[in-house]
């Protein structure tokens, strides 16, 4: 009988199955890392926006002069966020000494994340002694249609 060398079909299928499992695992890790990076970017941009508004309008008695185009131009950043939505600034209608940062264009899971995240410098977070996140949101829309509001000021 003659000796044959090479791989059998079963061995090749085993190798392909292992490679498939590795690929699925790597894809999940990459997706998680990208989601975390986007969330961190939004957090940093909100901090930059809040700092900019306070520096530009902090000397006034209230934030009634807030203007999206002027503020974003003055702080040197776009009002676009990493989710393809926008940031919006506005005066709190119940208290002109407070301003609201709105994050638009979020998926349901990202909206829920930002609503539960501790926005430590926000009005509601400080009033509750850290028991509330400081954000409110509408997270029931379709992906890309959800928004989160965070109030800052006194």
Question: At which residue positions do the language-model features occur?
Answer:
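Periplasmic/extracellular, small/polar-rich flexible segments of pilin-like filament-forming proteins
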Residues: 55-154
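Weak global preference for isoleucine
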Residues: 10, 18, 22, 30, ...
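Extracytoplasmic/periplasmic, Sec-exported soluble proteins
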Residues: 38-41, 106
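N-terminal alpha-helical signal peptides/signal-anchor transmembrane segments
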Residues: 30-36, 43-64
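N-terminal single-pass transmembrane signal-anchor helix
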Residues: 1-35, 42
């Amino acid at each position: 009988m003659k000796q044959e060398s090479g791989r059998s079909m079963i061995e090749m299928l085993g190798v392909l199955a292992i490679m498939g499992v590795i690929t699925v695992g790597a894809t999940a890790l990459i997706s998680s890392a990208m989601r975390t990076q986007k969330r961190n970017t939004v957090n940093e941009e909100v901090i930059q926006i809040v700092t900019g508004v306070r520096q530009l309008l902090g000397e006034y008695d209230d934030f009634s002069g807030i203007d999206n185009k002027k503020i974003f131009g003055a702080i040197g950043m776009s009002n676009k966020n990493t989710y393809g939505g926008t940031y919006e600034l506005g005066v709190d209608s119940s208290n002109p000494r407070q301003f609201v940062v709105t994050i638009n264009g979020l998926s349901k899971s990202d909206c829920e994340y930002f609503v539960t995240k501790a926005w430590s410098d926000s009005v509601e977070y400080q009033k509750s002694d850290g028991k509330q996140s400081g954000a409110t949101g509408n997270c029931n829309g379709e992906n890309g249609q959800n928004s989160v509001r965070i109030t800052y000021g006194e």
